């Protein structure tokens, strides 16, 4: 792109950053420093506002950049992410949303510790939540780096690295200054921008093919170089048994992982009642479902109009398919329309990244302060002290996310999110479901469920082709690959459930049935909910 084109895109980036910083400053004027205000925004948001914020939190760089890129490169197999991300919300709606809102205050650990020995359970759940959040943050950082590399013509590695650092700095500012209230409004603004941008691009793609989806798919298949195989399963997850098991593993992780994501669970605490939480999820499903239907058109549109080779040439993982599609739909690289549309889409993608990293950072810093700090500190911490720790933790989490984001910069963002979902489904979902629905569940079972899912998931990722043993690995020059699957969910998710069951049946501690009855009534009726 020319210097003028880069300037326009950077101006739009800067405008969004200025708006979000203004929102953060405005929201932080009247803050009182209470934990409820910092973690939950005072529980003052309406179901519609929270539904938009949930969708803004969930529709990440993985959705806008990564999924469309995978569809553009691998056709049918890329659709697994679309189906998995959407179907996952049925699990959230029917099993989690209302019960979590009634039983907890700020974090996942609040729900689990309601009927257990608090200290070991909070430490385990807090550790797991921070781990999942950092993995999810890494994907957003990689998306930011890919976006700016494209904007600057892919020639400046330093600019790409500084972008990752800049995103990390901004997310710390958003969280430490504005807490949940600022984060929520940033996510609402971003959701509106993202839906508007996706609708505009989808309409332009359909107009290009005269509204004929069949023609769009045929053109994508012809341009892909794979013919009809592009529209059939197996291009990415086909062939041998390893690829097929990887397909199943990823599907399990995507469908079950959403219900264990800390930054999604924390959104249910920002509304006043469980009924409002359920209605928030209904709003979110409508928005998210509409968005993922559009990613189908955008992914195949990028394959048909831009071509997989051009997408892969810009970014090997496919993370730049949507901006390239916008450039072409607007008239090409040398046209004013192409430049403007590219800049708008790039700014929306950047807004997507900033909004999501703010929500994830807030959830992880809340886990550090509310779960780990208060548990490791023998004396009960004051709310203001806890909030101070959360703000400090945001800085540390930002540094870790930046470092890992620089390391993983060449991986696909949707793939990285798939790993985060696998860890969430392995470590957080078993303990959450057991706590809510199993009367005989014990403290040992809770701790074993978390670590029995978390440790194998991380270990299997380290021993997988993601880290070593192939040209696409993080460390292609070494080989300590002993686990053949790229996503550990198929093995680690059952292990999490098994460990929770085994820890409970071997525990000498009798289950507290009175506390379970109290929790059950509270979760179903809302009696005594905060």
Feature map (PLM): residue ranges:
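Loop-to-helix junctions at membrane interfaces in multi-pass transport proteins
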Residues: 2-6, 42-45, 49, 66-80, ...
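Helix-loop-helix junctions that connect adjacent transmembrane helices in secondary transporters/permeases
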Residues: 67-177, 267-418, 528-530
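Membrane-interface loop-to-helix entry segments
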Residues: 5-36, 106-108, 113-149, 162-222, ...
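Hydrophobic cores of alpha-helical transmembrane segments in multi-pass inner/ER membrane proteins
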Residues: 87-94, 427-432, 436, 492-503
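A generic transmembrane alpha-helix motif of multi-pass inner-membrane proteins
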Residues: 2-24, 246, 443-530
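Short, Lys/Arg-enriched, Gly/Pro-containing loop segments at transmembrane-helix junctions
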Residues: 32-38, 110, 213-218, 414-417, ...
